[in-house]
Structures are given as structure tokens and as C-alpha cells.
Amino acid sequence: MKQYLELCRRIVSEGEWVANERTGKRCLTVINADLEYDVANNQFPLITTRKSYWKAAIAEFLGYIRGYDNAADFRELGTKTWDANANENAAWLANPHRRGVDDMGRVYGVQGRAWRKPNGETIDQLRKIVNNLTKGIDDRGEILTFFNPGEFDLGCLRPCMHTHTFSLVGDTLHLTSYQRSCDVPLGLNFNQIQVFTFLALMAQITGKKAGKAYHKIVNAHIYEDQLELMRDVQLKREPFPLPKLEINPDIKTLEDLETWVTMDDFKVVGYQSHEPIKYPFSV
């Protein structure tokens, strides 16, 4: 929690106003933020200065792992995070590639599980990484990326947290995740949960020990309609100790994640928080 609050204070005190064309709003912005999560000791980075709805964050990333491209599939997992971008984004609604209600296009998990090659074949990036790590192989290119400029016009949103690099040192697995842009009051709440959980899951299904997860953010910002709540409410609160994340030990393979895993297979223990804060969301 300390590093999260320090970033929020840094944005409030040092940030500069930048106009955002997509949303039509200004953002108080800083460049470069580095966060670190201790997955080995299960220090789950769940925000405590407001209530954090962690299940939706894990559900969303599980949808990426499965390569989902439809908001309805995400809702079935337990998260509505893609409803707005799939159905209320004006540019996407006017895009001829959109295939109807709830369609997200070729974003996030689609790129991770079915990156198109010029010959029409696809690459399953995640499968390659899992196969290598299970064999104890780290070719210094165990990289999962959702960032495909050649297909930005085929999706409703460019990826914000776009690339995940796994590093194997002995039998300990580490993760470095890269994010081009972060809505800190809303998005970071999700993203840090996802980075932590992704490493924990990958270590579990490849038979490795989880180490540390490193989270690198380029553009960290607070929207102008979020600033008052962050400065005058959330930053006035004292944080509670971090909880722990329990994952069903029966999850042993990528196929398990693709087929039967639900939010019932995850549990947070020892979570205390302050009251919720309803931050505005910018589509």
C-alpha cells in the first residue's frame, strides 16, 4: 500500500495537466512509476484505503488468458469491465469491423492467444511460455504482448497494460509487466491485482516458485473529475495491513485455467478496508 499511496501523492503534488483527446478530459500526469509486488511472501497488493473489488480484476485477466473477445464472456466470468468499451465507445461503434453488441474486437487476450502471422496462421504466445517454463527453459524471450499496432483498428481499445515478461532464475519465476497508461484511481486498483495473480498462477501451473513481480508504468494519471476524491478523501485515510491471496491448489495446468476455473477458486484472507469511493470512469 505504501508505494501505491506514494504514487498517488506524487501525482497530486508533482503532476502536470495534460489534455486527453479520447475522453475530452484533462489528466494530472507524471511519467514513469515502478511498483514491486512480493508474490513469494503472498503480500497481496489489494488497496485498503477504499474497498477494492478484487474478483472482477482476476475475472478480467482470466478472460485474457482464455482469449475472450466478447464482453458477454467477461460478464459470465464475473466482471462488467468491458461493457462500456465494447458498447459505448463512439469510435468503436462507428468502426466497420465491429461485429455487434458486446464485440471487443482483436484486443488483449486475442493477441496473446492468436496473434496473426502474414500467412494467416496464428501464434499462441501464452502456450509457448507455459511450455518453456514447465521444462525449466527461459530463452530470455518469454514475452506475452497484447500490443499489435497492425490491428489497432480491429479492436475497441489499445491495451494499457500491454506486455508481460517472465524470467526464470533457478526454480524461481519472476514477472515484469509494462503499462503504457494508467488511470491510477481506477485502473491501478485492477492492474496490480492482475500482475500479482498472473505471476502466482503461472508459477503454480509450471511447477515453479513465485518470486517478485515488477510493474512498470509510463503515463500515470488522475482524471480531473477524480482529483478531489483522491486528494481530499482517499489520501486522508490510513492503510490497513495487506491481505493474502489463496488459489485453489487443484489448478495445475493452462487447460484448467481455460476450462473449469471460476472465481470460487480464489479467496482473499485478512482483508480490511475503508468505505468504497465511487470514482468516475472515462470511456
UniProtKB/Swiss-Prot annotation:
DUMP binds at residues 22, 180-183, 191, 221-223. It catalyses: dUMP + (6R)-5,10-methylene-5,6,7,8-tetrahydrofolate = 7,8-dihydrofolate + dTMP. It comes from the Bacteria. Keywords: Cytoplasm, Methyltransferase, Nucleotide biosynthesis, Transferase. InterPro entries: Thymidate_synth/dCMP_Mease (IPR045097), Thymidate_synth/dCMP_Mease_dom (IPR023451), Thymidate_synth/dCMP_Mease_sf (IPR036926), Thymidylate_synthase (IPR000398), Thymidylate_synthase_AS (IPR020940). One of its GO terms (cellular component) is cytosol. The active site is at 160 (nucleophile). GO terms for biological process: dTMP biosynthetic process; dTTP biosynthetic process; methylation. It is an enzyme of class 2 (transferase). SUPFAM superfamilies: Thymidylate synthase/dCMP hydroxymethylase. Catalyzes the reductive methylation of 2'-deoxyuridine-5'-monophosphate (dUMP) to 2'-deoxythymidine-5'-monophosphate (dTMP) while utilizing 5,10-methylenetetrahydrofolate (mTHF) as the methyl donor and reductant in the reaction, yielding dihydrofolate (DHF) as a by-product. This enzymatic reaction provides an intracellular de novo source of dTMP, an essential precursor for DNA biosynthesis. Homodimer. Belongs to the thymidylate synthase family. Bacterial-type ThyA subfamily. This is Thymidylate synthase. The lineage of its organism: Bacteria, Pseudomonadati, Pseudomonadota, Gammaproteobacteria, Pasteurellales. The gene is thyA.
